[in-house]
């Protein structure tokens, strides 16, 4: 039982004729080459002044100068520094000068009375266990 598969004649004819895909590929390759040449010519042109002040995506990429200024976010101009507001003077500074230095900065060594109170609180807290 041998069955021979016979290809339809129309399919054989399509093999002999040049396909339309190859001609389309040639056209697209030519278009790409033209676009590449156009891009290169634009790249080598000097930058022209652009007065567009919009920062939307479309305007940031519409020319090389806008891309360098807006798209990359690089500014070569000198930035102005923000001035800080002067600190407000305290109205209670005279009362602070009356106090001794140790009370303003805090005592690093507790006095005898403070030691006694801390010891008694520790003793009472320790005895509250189970």
Swiss-Prot record:
Region annotation (Cysteine-rich) ranges: 50-66
Region (Core): 67-77
Start-end of Low complexity biased regions: 119-130
Subcellular location: Host nucleus, Host nucleolus
Modified residues (Phosphoserine): 94
Motif (Nuclear localization signal, and RNA-binding (TAR)): 78-90
Superkingdom: Viruses
Assembly mode: Interacts with host CCNT1. Associates with the P-TEFb complex composed at least of Tat, P-TEFb (CDK9 and CCNT1), TAR RNA, RNA Pol II. Interacts with CCNT2; the resulting complex is unable to bind to TAR RNA.
Protein's name in the database: Protein Tat
Record organism: Human immunodeficiency virus type 2 subtype A (isolate Ghana-1)
Gene: tat
